[in-house]
Structure formats: C-alpha cells, structure tokens
C-alpha cells in the first residue's frame, strides 16, 4: 500500500502459463498499541500479519481477470504473543476464508478485478471486493488515449463506492490497516469517490488536470484503528482540484520546469477552503 507505513514483506511472482500468473506476498503489520509490559527500553507495538494471493488470467488479448485473496492474521494481543496460524502460508486462493472460521484470529478480504481493452486507445476496468462475504465495495473506470485525434493525450474517469462496513473486522485488532493507516484507500471506508484526470503533451509542453470529489457517508476517521474512543460520524463532501503546466527540457532525465495550482474544499473541516501554488 502507498498509503500506510512501510513494512517488511516477502513476495514472489510466478508465471504458470502464457495466460496464467500468480503473485504471492506475506507481510508483518503493526497496530499502534504498545504492549503494557516490556523488558526493553521501549515497549513494542502489537504485530499482526498480512497474506495476499493474487491470481491473474488473461482470457483473451483484450480481457484480463484477476482474483485477489487477502487476509489479516492475529499474532497475539497487548499481553501475549503467538505464532501465526499455519494457514497463513497457504498459497491457494479462497481456501483460508473457508478453512479458518475464527474471526478473532483471521479477517478475510476477497476481490475480483477485470479490465477490457476495446482498442489500443480505450480501456475499461473494474473491481469488486468483499469482507467475509458479508458486505462489499466496487470500482468502475476507463482510460481513453489520443481522444478526438489528439496525440499524446489521455482522459480518465473513475468511480469508487466503499461502505462504512468494509475493511472493518469484528476483532478491531485485525482491521485492514497498518500503523493506524488504511491499507486500501486514504479515506479508509464510508465514502463515494469520483476521479477525473486529463493530460496532454505538445512537443515539450504539457498540461495535467486532476479532479477528485469525495462524498463521506457515515465516515469515521479512526474506525480502522485497533482501539479508539472516537465515535464521531462524519458526512459531507471534499473537493480536490490540481492543475499543472510544465515544459520538459530533457525527457530522458525528466528535467522539467513546471508550475501548479491546488484548490481543496472540505465542508467537514474547520478550514474548509485551501489553496496552494
């Protein structure tokens, strides 16, 4: 995740056939809860573990489908430590969610990704995700290159819908987070998001425009933390606009002179309007 803290991990990529590939990753995460008893100078944070199995199938030259199987595993609590369950190392997608039924030890996430290239210029993509097969979220979007005959131009639109119950485990210590930061999205859950992007390059000049609109619905900033007394529920809208204009002196080393303007409007904040140059 680009949003949470760095964490140690091991991973491997395996090409099973010309159409089938597999990604295996295991990581050690932290809850920002210190153990109450320690023999060291500083108490350790509570550890937990993350497993990811990602299977990708290229059905045709245009259609690609991927199955995501992720899980957060208990390694103890604030007092005791224990080895992670042996099923943590299992590489077979979906098996963990079936074989491990103890919600106090394991939190399961299952997702399905798909992308379809209509042509070299137009690509649609989407994603579905569910936690313990109880509730889910989805993403839909497309990218269009060289639209209207404009060379070196790209437009992208994307929509994300993530209910407030997604990524939250019945055992709060196993929620989908690391270091009190969400793994999947900067807002965690409880939001709708619309993303628009346009960029165009002419010779050495370029322009890049980004627009993001969040609609927060029953959102809690700390709901993915291992422990929180903050029960404040937030609803509202956040708008983010960014404009960048630049000139590339050397494309090989990306030597660029640019200027940018950022505008942010947040009706859930005490500082609703912010501008940056």
Stretch-by-stretch model annotation:
Residues 58-59, 63-277:
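Exposed, low-structure sequence patches enriched in small/polar residues
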